[in-house]
C-alpha cells in the first residue's frame, strides 16, 4: 500500500549538513498512475534549474514528502552513518501525522526503498521493511522524488547560509554547495575551516594539527 522512497544528499560535502529525503506514495491514491512529473530522475543527473522546476510538482504528486538533516557538527561528533540515520529519523517525524499514523497502524503494508549499497537507516523506520537498491534514485520514481526534494532543500539552505554570512564568500558555498572545488580548497588552506565545515573530513586537505 505504501512505497517509501529514501535518498541522501550531501554525504560527500565538505561543509553544511547531510540531508535525507523521503517520498511516500500510497498505491490506492495513485491507482496505478504513471503520470509522474516529466524529467523526474536522480537529482544528480539533472540540472539545478530543472530540479527547482520539479520541486513543487514532485511534492504535489507524491502522497507526502519530507527532508531531515544533520549538521556538520553532528557529523563530526557521531560519524556520517549515525548522521544519516538521524536525518532519516527527522525526515520521518516531519511527515504529516496522518501518513505516519497510517503506516504505523499497518507497517506490513509498507515497503521502503533506499538508494545505495548499505542500509544506514538504523531503527528509523521501526518495523517497516526496507530494501537497499543500487541506482534506485535513477530507477525508482519514489526514490527519484526523494532525491530531488532533498537536493533542492539542502541547496537552498546552503545558499541562504552563504547569503547570511558574508565571511563564507571566499569558500564559494553558494556555487559549490559545500562540495570540494579548487576555490573551496584554496580558501580552506588560506583561511581555515568555519563552524559550518566538517572538520573530520578535512584532514587530508589541512592535516590534523590545523583542525584539532
Stretches with model-predicted labels:
Residues 1-212:
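RNase H-like, Mg2+-dependent phosphodiesterase core
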Amino acid at each position: 500500500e505504501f512505497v517509501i522512497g529514501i535518498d541522501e544528499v550531501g554525504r560527500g560535502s565538505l561543509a553544511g549538513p547531510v540531508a535525507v529525503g523521503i517520498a511516500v506514495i500510497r498505491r490506492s491514491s495513485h491507482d496505478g498512475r504513471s503520470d509522474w512529473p516529466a524529467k523526474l530522475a536522480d537529482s544528480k543527473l539533472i540540472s539545478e534549474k530543472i530540479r527547482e522546476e520539479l520541486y513543487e510538482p514532485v511534492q504535489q504528486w507524491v502522497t507526502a514528502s519530507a527532508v531531515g538533516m544533520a549538521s556538520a557538527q553532528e557529523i563530526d561528533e557521531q560519524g556520517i552513518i549515525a548522521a544519516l540515520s538521524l536525518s532519516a529519523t527527522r525526515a520521518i517525524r516531519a511527515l504529516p501525522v496522518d501518513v505516519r499514523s497510517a503506516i504505523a497502524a499497518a507497517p506490513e503494508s509498507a515497503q521502503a526503498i533506499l538508494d545505495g549499497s548499505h542500509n544506514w537507516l538504523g531503527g528509523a523506520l521501526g518495523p517497516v521493511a526496507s530494501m537497499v537498491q543500487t541506482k534506485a534514485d535513477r530507477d525508482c520514481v519514489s526514490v527519484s522524488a526523494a532525491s530531488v526534494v532533498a537536493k533542492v532543500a539542502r541547496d537552498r539552505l546552503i545558499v541562504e547560509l552563504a547569503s547570511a554570512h558574508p565571511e563564507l564568500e571566499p569558500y564559494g558555498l553558494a556555487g559549490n554547495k559545500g562540495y570540494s572545488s579548487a576555490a573551496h580548497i584554496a580558501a580552506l588552506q588560506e583561511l581555515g575551516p568555519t563552524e559550518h565545515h566538517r572538520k573530520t573530513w578535512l584532514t587530508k586537505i589541512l592535516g590534523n594539527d590545523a583542525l584539532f
